[in-house]
Amino acid sequence: NISLGKHVQINLDCTIGHDVVMEDYATLAPGVHLSGYVHVGKRAYIGTGAVIINGIQGNPIVIGDDAVVGAGACVTQSIPPGETWVGVPARPIRK
């Protein structure tokens, strides 16, 4: 149950779990891991080796439109639109 929008870019060695939605122009850098129940917004960028921990049915982890996830980050909660998050666990550095 994966849904991909227009012009989505998925690089080498990425893993995409169940019930994932990727909206238009979203990008996964190499080595990204999306667990189940993840929603990636329009134009969102997920950096190399980042991990998005799974959400739950009816309450996915949402990476907002135009959000950026830094390389190697571990995302454990939803990220609002337009924000940049980095680190383990991921935290905002720019809104």
Regions inferred by a protein language model and the residue ranges of each:
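Structural signal for interior beta-strand "rungs" in well-ordered beta-sheet cores
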Residues: 2-87, 91-93
